[in-house]
Amino acid sequence: MDLMSFKEKELSKKDCVELFEDTENFFDILKLADSLRKDIVGDTVTYVVNANINFTNVCSGTCKFCAFKAEHGDPNAFFLSPEQVAKKALEARKTGATEVCIQGGLLKEIDTYFQAEILKKVKEITKTYGGIDVHAFSPMEVKSAAENAGLSVKEALKILKENGLNSMPGTAAEILDDEVRSEICPTKLKTSEWIDVVSTAHKTGINTTCTMMYGHIEENKHLAEHLSILRKIQKETGGFTEFVPLTFLHENAPLHHMDRVKSGASGMLDLKVYAISRIFFKDYIKNIQTSWVKLGTKLSQISLNCGANDIGGTLMEESISKAAGGSYGTYMSEEKLKDMVLAVGRIPKQRNTCYEIIE
């Protein structure tokens, strides 16, 4: 395999599968990705001071990888009002956060107008403190809420944008293959529906991230197809701000008990996903984020030498990974994030949601 040709060449899905299957050139693949990272984004490693706000853990979804969900009436169930969400956002803003990531569940009482009320309250309460970027509602949440409100996705996104939605998390992607989705998240939106929601968001002027959850039942061909779909969307809309690989946290997830399911990804696969995504996307998607919550500090630092150039955020509150068995904490101070980056000889810089550097 002529790896150096991949530095300039646009990879096909076949090339991508071959890279995932290649065990002999593991370190050369990482080295190539790091070289591309340096060419495309330099030695700066970005981070965002942010807070996660999950406004409910009650959900009608049937995702088999989720350990966060609660049923109505469960002693640990909660549902925050728009005013309560806004107060949490204000607390985050007062402690220096420039972004809040707001997500909830799938319920009949959550429609587009409820989501818009959350946005409105957050924008109003933080205005005195310079405002805050709101990164909220997954494609699945947007679609479900639109249906509950009797709106099209396009109409719903227009309302959300008018009420202050700055960007959306590109979660609910998992693996963009309907055969895989039918096993791991049978009632979630189909691949074509996920594509429609994010593409419509981009055309409405709402940027999104994009994600891929791996290390469960997927095969290499599914990873290649997923990356190919994301690249195609980016070529058409340019609306993805970053790619975030999400390693499957298996410990508490119901999916873990299925016969075919792996016990999460190996450390080698984690690093390969970062590297191959960098080689595959090149500068179509310039920013690749590593997740210290899922990988831990040390593996995240290594991933910065395998294609990644962003270490995510301080989070302040992160419940979903913790519920699934994540053991790396739910908050990291800005100073610790900087130290993480400096320790591997790179330059830490704070950014906002749109990857603009905050001096």
Swiss-Prot record:
Required cofactor(s): [4Fe-4S] cluster
Assembly and oligomerization: Consists of two subunits, CofG and CofH.
InterPro entries recorded: Aldolase_TIM, CofH/MnqC-like_C, CofH_family, Elp3/MiaA/NifB-like_rSAM, F420, FO_synthase_su2, rSAM
Binding site for [4Fe-4S] cluster: 59, 63, 66
Record's catalysed reaction(s): 5-amino-6-(D-ribitylamino)uracil + L-tyrosine + S-adenosyl-L-methionine = 5-amino-5-(4-hydroxybenzyl)-6-(D-ribitylimino)-5,6-dihydrouracil + 2-iminoacetate + 5'-deoxyadenosine + L-methionine + H(+)
Cofactor stoichiometry and binding remark: Binds 1 [4Fe-4S] cluster. The cluster is coordinated with 3 cysteines and an exchangeable S-adenosyl-L-methionine.
Natural source organism: Methanococcus maripaludis (strain DSM 14266 / JCM 13030 / NBRC 101832 / S2 / LL)
Protein name: 5-amino-6-(D-ribitylamino)uracil--L-tyrosine 4-hydroxyphenyl transferase 1
PROSITE patterns xref list: RADICAL_SAM
EC nos: 2.5.1.147
Record pathway: Cofactor biosynthesis; coenzyme F0 biosynthesis
Entry similarity comment: Belongs to the radical SAM superfamily. CofH family.
Domain Radical SAM core: 45-282
NCBIfam families given in the database record: CofH family radical SAM protein, F420_cofH, PRK07360.1
GO molecular function: 4 iron, 4 sulfur cluster binding; 5-amino-6-(D-ribitylamino)uracil--L-tyrosine 4-hydroxyphenyl transferase activity; 7,8-didemethyl-8-hydroxy-5-deazariboflavin synthase activity; iron ion binding
Keyword set, alphabetical order: 4Fe-4S, Iron, Iron-sulfur, Metal-binding, S-adenosyl-L-methionine, Transferase
Function: Catalyzes the radical-mediated synthesis of 5-amino-5-(4-hydroxybenzyl)-6-(D-ribitylimino)-5,6-dihydrouracil from 5-amino-6-(D-ribitylamino)uracil and L-tyrosine.
UniProt-listed Pfam families: CofH_C, Radical_SAM
